[in-house]
Structure formats: C-alpha cells, structure tokens
Amino acid sequence: MKGRGLAMKVLTSLAVVAGAAALSACTGLGGSEYGYSSYGLVRVTRVRVGDGQMSVVAPRPYNRHRRILFSDVNDVEDWTLNGPILDGISFVSGMKNNRELIRQRRTADQQVPRFRSDMTPPEITAMLESLYRVKGGAVDLKTLSLQPRPFLGANGFQWDYEHLDQDELWRRGRAVGAVIDGKLYLILMDAARSHYYDAELPDFEAIVASAQRLG
C-alpha cells in the first residue's frame, strides 16, 4: 500500500495506483513504493490480520487492501470504510526486531526507522511520525496525547495525533499498541478530521477491544 497508514498515507485511491506521487492521498501503513493495489471484503466475523499473529472482529463490513504486484510487508495490513483518502485502519501483527513498516529503496535519501524490540512508546510514535512525514507527505503533525493503555493483555500505549498533508486536508489518528515478547502489535486509525474521524472512532475502539494475539 502506499500512503501512510499504521501506519498512514501510503496507499492510493480506490482501485489502483503506482508511484510515490500517490503517497499524500491515502491512509495506510504497509506496502512498497511501487505496484498496483486492489480491495477485498472483510466480513463481520473474526479474521486474522497481517501475517496471522493477531485476529479482530469488525463491527461492520470493511475493505481490505491487497497488492497485485510486489508483496506486502507481511506484518502490516490496511482496511478502509470509505476509501483511503477519507479513512483507514492499519494493523501491525507482531512485527519482529529490525523489520520495516513499509518497503523502502535502500538508496532513498530519507528512511523511515526500522522497528527495534527495545523501543519505548515515544520512540515508536516517533517512528510512525517519520512514516507520515517521509513517505506520507505530512507537512505538519501534532501529538495530542501519549498515554498508557492496556492492549492484548500487556502494558501498552495510546497515541492521539493530527496531521496536515500536501492535499491541504487535516487528518486525525489514534494508535493503540504494545511490544510483547519483543514484537510490535498495533492498531492505528487515520481519517479526515471533519466528520470521518468521529464517525469511525467507535468502530476502531470495537476492533481494538476484539483483538486477540495468536502468535
């Protein structure tokens, strides 16, 4: 996916996209810097996300982002309700030490930091902010709060933030995550600040509450 995502604008418009120019138009975390994408239906039942180490239940049908060319970052998966320009939910399902949230060219001047298993919540949120700025095209990003929150039976965190992108649209997000046995588990919602964030927040909270660790 291209945009960001988890994990925020890194995908694209509703059907397919190619190239880094689409980065500022989407809300998602994983994926590569090139390739085409499509969507599949997520039904209201328990489903595994990412590489299968976490499962959740959506309160209503969602669209799961899939790649046609080039493989996804297996630990990261993205959903949308109204299209990635308006809203997105990203899942990181047990990312191991030294792994990336998004595939990157090694020759790129700016790099999103890799996850480290000893990262603190402030360091994880700094990694996510870097994803938004470097790959998502955010021109301004503000942390609204960072606080402890239980997640998957562990001591986790909740990060609330908002960002202005190159398309001049303010978006707001919330990430809930924890590092368990050295792996990052995280669910992130990012949506247009006007209407879409508040409308989708109850869905996000229901999905977070339903999350189960399988790996």
Predicted regions and their residues:
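N-terminal targeting sequences that direct proteins away from the cytosol to non-cytosolic compartments
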Residues: 2-99, 140, 148-154, 165-170, ...
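Intrinsically disordered, low-complexity coil segments
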Residues: 87, 106-108, 134-135
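Compositionally biased, low-structure terminal segments
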Residues: 92, 102, 113-116, 133, ...
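Acidic/histidine-rich, surface-exposed loop or edge segments in extracytoplasmic proteins
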Residues: 97-112
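Short intrinsically disordered coil segments
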Residues: 107-108, 176, 204
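Second-shell loop/turn segments in exported
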Residues: 110-118, 193-198
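Signature of long, low-cysteine stretches enriched in small and polar/charged residues
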Residues: 113-176
